[in-house]
Amino acid sequence: IVGQLVEIPVGPKEHRRLIPIITDEYPDPDFGSGAVKITGAHDFNDYAVAMRNAIPLYALMDTKGAMRQDGLPYADSAAIATRAANGEDVGDVSNVNLVPEDLRGLDRYDARKLVIDQIGAEGLAVTYLHKEIDRETGAEHLERRALVDAKPIMQPFGDRSGVVIEPMLTDQWFVDTQRIVGPALDAVRDGRTQIIPDQHRKV
């Protein structure tokens, strides 16, 4: 099946995109099925897999953790992504928005729940039987739930905020501190810049 294309079961059926089945050393065959979907723009490990396998980096979220609203309509974006899955060089994908219209602008957690519900409604989600006991009556309540809800995943959290850190590709700016520090130190040494109070000159 390697090299074949599979449908992502999200979005309008007539416009669903296809992705290639690839092999890579990253997935753990002892965790779940050993198959994973790669979202290179939003996961450190997926980024490495995408780079090794020439998978375009499609951004799905904005800087506030909501699903993107900008870019091309979903149908156009899905068509471009499917061409890329077939090996075509599609160039810059920054305007490609693979978030279906009904999910655009939603908080990532709300969108995730809707995606799970949509996949479940089509009978495509792997499910398990969840049992709850009513504390007052002792009655047992069984409910079928998507297995994805019960699977533990590694997520980085901010050490101060406790909020989930969502990796995303952004422009990075670097400053050549060697070129900046030298003239600044010279200005302090020759008196053009005065540090007040004086004891902080060494800092």
PLM regions: where:
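Short conserved beta-strand and strand-loop elements enriched in small hydrophobics
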Residues: 3-12
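Short beta-strand-centered aromatic/proline hotspots
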Residues: 18-24
